[in-house]
A protein has these predicted regions:
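A short beta-strand/loop micro-motif in the catalytic core of glycosyltransferases
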Residues: 109-110, 160-170
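Nucleotide-sugar donor phosphate/pyrophosphate-binding loop at the beta->alpha transition
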Residues: 89-96, 129-132, 140-157, 196
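Membrane-proximal helix-turn-helix segments that form the acceptor-binding/catalytic region
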Residues: 98-103, 125, 148-165
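Histidine-centered beta-alpha loop that forms part of the nucleotide-sugar donor binding/catalytic region
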Residues: 11, 135-138, 191-192
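Carbohydrate-associated surface elements
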Residues: 171, 193
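Nucleotide-sugar donor-binding and catalytic loop/hinge architecture
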Residues: 200-209
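A conserved catalytic-core segment of Leloir-type glycosyltransferases
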Residues: 5-101
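Active-site proximal beta-strand in glycosyltransferases
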Residues: 108-110, 117, 121-141
């Protein structure tokens, strides 16, 4: 907000997102070239994606993904939530991130959780821009120590490539350092918080009960 421009890459936007963000629906980014006319695109794309943007993304498809399951626009669909093919959707999201990173101009990449770490790593490799990942919890926390090796591998690869690792607590930071063998200098604890009250609200007398 303010002097920060944020591009928010969502797998499956609802159309109800905050307007101060630039929304990119990853399910509207083509990965397979399709010859689609302008009027048809206007009828198929949501308000937050223009035909011009679609064509621009189409020009930045970087590999042959014709073996992937795509729709009539050459885009991949996402189930949303935590489907049975979750790891496939994580991989698909990272493929699309490669197209987006080749098209967009930005200063820093933020990967919100382990599901988006592969996409963040891909965007960093494409752009050379720094990657900051957010760690709300690790698989050590979620599994009570019975770690899923696939999830651990995704988490660690994201951490290894990250320039900054934001942890929601000092406990999480220590887990990242000790269990994922990360450099303490790039791990910071940033607690979930709210904005402080403005002074005029702080000056309102408290009611004594």
């Amino acid at each position: 907000q303010g002097d920060v421009e944020t591009t928010f890459c969502l797998p499956k936007p609802t159309g109800e997102e905050e307007k101060f963000l630039k929304i990119i629906g990853m399910n509207q980014v083509p990965v397979v070239w399709r010859d689609v006319n302008y009027d048809y695109l206007k009828s198929r794309l949501p308000d937050y994606t223009s035909p011009e943007e679609y064509y621009s993304f189409r020009d930045h498809i970087y590999a042959d993904f014709s073996y992937m399951h795509v729709n009539d626009l050459g885009c991949m669909e996402f189930a949303g939530g935590y489907p049975k093919n979750l790891h496939e959707e994580i991989n698909n999201y990272s493929i699309i991130a490669g197209v987006v990173a080749r098209r967009q101009e930005f200063d820093i990449i933020h990967a919100h959780d382990w599901l988006t770490y592969p996409a963040g790593v891909h965007a960093k490799m494409v752009s050379g821009k720094p990657l900051c990942i957010h760690v709300h919890a690790t698989d050590f926390d979620r599994s009570r120590g019975q770690v899923n090796p696939t999830v651990y591998s995704i988490e660690k690869n994201g951490m290894d490539h990250a320039d900054c690792i934001m942890c929601v607590s000092e406990l999480t930071r220590q887990t990242v350092i000790n269990k994922y063998h990360q450099d303490p200098r790039k791990c910071v604890a940033m607690h979930n918080a709210v904005y402080p009250l403005s002074q005029d609200l702080q000056d309102i007398p408290r009611v004594e009960h």
